[in-house]
């Protein structure tokens, strides 16, 4: 299974790779936040792997995202992306780690073509359990960026989703 870096298409302060970092005020024993570096001239991002429900990775299908890094046993679950609970300050949900692979929960995402350039990430709760006849994307939310303690944190947004490309590592 290949690893990729998720790279923001923007340049300068609008650019920057996605990485695993420590969430402010978190008491988790491992890094547990999904962030984007503040500039495209910053360090390289943390590699990820995409784990599809089926055998291959395609656009617009449910998948899990996992930071693909060596880690101690205690921190393995802190590599799998999920959407956290509502953050009152930001009035949205922040992306964090601690998700589960293959479970019907808040750990499912999709990669879709951006309306501008590149791709967007969507958070998509596993909807077949919620609503058997609903269009699948009805429950999906766009992933963008909020500023948390000077860091760019990935979060669910209504506007300005993060436009990204994927670089195989």
Swiss-Prot record:
**CDD domains attached to this UniProt entry:** beta-trefoil_STI_CPI-like (cd23372)
Residues with attached carbohydrate? 1
Keyword list, A-Z? Aspartic protease inhibitor, Disulfide bond, Glycoprotein, Protease inhibitor, Serine protease inhibitor, Vacuole
For this record, the Gene Ontology CC terms, alphabetical, are:
vacuole
Q: Where in the cell is it found?
A: Vacuole
The annotated site for Reactive bond for chymotrypsin falls at: 93-94
Q: What induces it?
A: By jasmonate.
User: Which Gene3D superfamilies does this one have?
Assistant: 2.80.10.50
Disulfides per UniProt? 30-75, 124-134
Site: Reactive bond for trypsin. Where?
A: 49-50
Q: Name one Pfam family in it.
A: Kunitz_legume
Q: Major location, coarse class?
A: other
Question: What is this protein's function?
Answer: Inhibitor of cathepsin D (aspartic protease). May also inhibit trypsin and chymotrypsin (serine proteases). Protects the plant by inhibiting proteases of invading organisms.
| Similarity-based family | Belongs to the protease inhibitor I3 (leguminous Kunitz-type inhibitor) family.
Q: What is this protein called?
A: Aspartic protease inhibitor 3
Taxonomic source organism: Solanum tuberosum (Potato)
């Amino acid at each position: 299974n290949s690893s990729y870096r998720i790279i923001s298409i923007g340049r300068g302060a609008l650019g920057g790779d996605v990485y695993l970092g420590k969430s402010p005020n978190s008491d988790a024993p491992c890094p547990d936040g999904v962030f984007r570096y503040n500039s495209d001239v910053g360090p390289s991002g943390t590699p990820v792997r995409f784990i599809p429900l089926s055998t291959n990775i395609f656009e617009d299908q449910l998948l899990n995202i996992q930071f693909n890094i060596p880690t101690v046993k205690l921190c393995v679950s802190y590599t799998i992306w999920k959407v956290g609970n509502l953050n009152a300050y930001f009035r949205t949900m922040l992306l964090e780690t601690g998700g589960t692979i293959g479970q019907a929960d808040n750990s499912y995402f999709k990669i879709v073509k951006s309306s501008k350039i590149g791709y967007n990430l969507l958070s998509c709760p596993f909807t077949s359990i919620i609503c058997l006849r609903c269009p699948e994307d009805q429950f999906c939310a766009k992933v963008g960026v909020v500023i948390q303690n000077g860091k760019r944190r990935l979060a669910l947004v209504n506007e300005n989703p993060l436009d990204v490309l994927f670089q195989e590592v």
